[in-house]
């Protein structure tokens, strides 16, 4: 079974319920959140969450600022600017603490 949460706050609540039910993340259920909150990332490091996704606010702000500068300077502006999400797992979680 897998629990996908729209944000880490939901994932942390789901983790409480999973533990209260006697289940073990990584053994009989998987748990993933979004936002890479420190508490969630620590739970990934500790093996209590399968992963989280970093919603790169710095990258988004940089893309928005760059697009704004292009617009103000009279340059062409793309309709969309994509900023990749970062998958945070046990392999890379420590660098996001």
Question: What are the functions of these language-model segments?
Answer:
Residues 15-23, 45, 49, 66-73:
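Sec-exported extracytoplasmic/periplasmic mature domains
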Residues 46-58:
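Short beta-strand elements at the ligand-binding edges of bilobed clamshell
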Residues 1-42:
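Hydrophobic alpha-helical
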Residues 56-97:
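Hinge/cleft segment of the Venus flytrap/periplasmic-binding protein
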